[in-house]
């Protein structure tokens, strides 16, 4: 029962409900980029994410800046609280990913986020989070990952 409740809580954090108001948060980053306060509702492959969100997807450089300029605090079974230079924060949930067969994997332990930056013809850069690491890494573009939008 505890695991079921935990999974439900993670899903609530990772997937906003329809019509929920969300805002863009100023973390005080040197670029002036604002980060949306919540993830988009679903997991997306790279092509679909690009078509649906376009220039609202962060570029690789935005993840590099976020990693470099912010303080990252792991919240057990939830993800990272990311605190900007000005003290404002966002939560990047460890929402896992959706496998090719449609199953959710790594919920509560890993988070994977697309950038708009391609790395060759079948990979794109993204942000990967686990309890002891935040990495900028390339992912296979058909993978279904989380999306966190920005405002430039």
In which residue ranges do the predicted regions lie?
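Sec-dependent N-terminal signal peptides
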Residues: 4-15
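C-terminal, surface-exposed recognition/capping segments
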Residues: 20-23, 27-29, 33-50, 54-152
